[in-house]
Amino acid sequence: MKTLALKGLDQSKVELVVQTPNPDPISWANTIRKFNGIGSDIIITYGAPVTLAAIREVDNIPIVFVDVYGPVEAGVTRSMAAPGRNLTGVSSKVPMITLIKAANDIKHIKSLGILYNGREIGSVIQLKEIRRLAAQMGFSVVELNVSSANMLDSALGTLTSSGVDFIYAAESTLVTRSLEKVILRARDHGIPVISHIPEAADKGALVTLEINTYEQGQLAGECVSAILQGKKQGQIPVATPKKVDLVINLKAAKLLDLNVPIQVLNISTKIVK
């Protein structure tokens, strides 16, 4: 809203209707239909699953997405330069190798556990990227597909007893909502958590590499403003935030009895103490 207000589109001219659906396809579809029913001029979606639901449900309302990891790979857009369809938005993709190398410099990775949701395309893309890095760097992966809340405890039990050196928490609605539980269970077994989930380090993860959420909001606001001023959404290039934070949690490192090398601290942009 701040970005829109700076462009002369404050709350006296723009009505914002916010919905927080349950993390399942039926709830996502019902929410999009509700927006369609009230005559929304633009629909803003958060994450690939909701965005894909919006694409299926509407073809006459512009969609602006945020926090989609790899919009092209996810099947959300045709390209970054010309997304096509009736949408544009903001990508949240960051280099997986930067995160994995930082973790490996703190503690050598022989085995990496992965919590992901096979029903969410962004989570699957991250899984595939880690598989490629594992083949290149020579570590093994233990993959746990967590697609419902009642699967989480079992998955955590498997990972914490499998001898993994780290747990990677892939982006998914379920894992994000349960992140503090994941981190605490892992810590009880001396296992650090790494992730791309925003603010994961503030919740206790050891290392995160994340897009700046404030900048994402600014870029989304610029997309909305351009559409309201008449620009075709499918011709607006997908934006990628320039600010990427490598966050190191020294408090978590101390609790896990790990030393963070100076070369990792030197490349970090934020340190949690």
Q: Which role does the model predict for each range below?
A:
Residues 1-273:
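Short hydrophobic alpha-helices and adjacent helix-cap/hinge residues
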